[in-house]
């Protein structure tokens, strides 16, 4: 599953509401909000950021992971097997029908609850012979029902 321009589209209010569940110190939340709107350099001038996490910011990967942790909990609640690293996610199911059902319902969850956009063109459903994920390719060996990994060549 692919999230469209993930780091650039994180909704600040949604992220702060998630953080507010665990962080009770308003000063910390205020500091995080200031970080989120601190802006980016475009050429020679600064532009304030209304959405997204500042690219290259030290907190950006952590804050992105916090919002996607909500997705992890939803997938676990549904007892789905998945692997996620940052905004790269693979969800494993047993059938094509289940895959379509999960894709539709998880897309709805991501877009309505997390206020993120799923890239439908890059998100795929299928029975893979090989899976490319995070720089490795996993090949299905049908007889043994195991996967072997091989690093991508750049």
Predicted regions, residues:
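Active-site and adjacent loop segments of nucleotide-processing enzymes
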Residues: 136-154
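Conserved polymerase palm-domain catalytic core
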Residues: 1-130, 136
């Amino acid at each position: 599953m692919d999230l469209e321009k993930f780091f650039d589209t994180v909704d600040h209010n949604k992220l702060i509401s998630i953080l507010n569940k665990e962080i009770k110190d308003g000063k910390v939340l205020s500091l995080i909000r200031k970080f989120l709107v601190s802006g980016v350099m475009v050429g020679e001038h600064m532009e304030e950021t209304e959405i997204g996490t500042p690219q290259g910011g030290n907190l950006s990967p952590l804050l992105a992971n916090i919002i996607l942790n909500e997705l992890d909990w939803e997938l676990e609640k549904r007892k789905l097997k998945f692997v996620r690293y940052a905004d790269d996610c693979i969800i494993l199911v047993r059938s094509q029908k289940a895959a379509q059902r999960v894709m539709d319902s998880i897309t709805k969850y991501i877009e309505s609850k997390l206020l993120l956009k799923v890239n439908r063109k890059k998100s795929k459903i299928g029975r893979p012979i090989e899976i490319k994920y995070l720089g490795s390719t996993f090949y299905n060996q049908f007889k043994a029902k195991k996967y072997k990994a091989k690093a991508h060549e750049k």
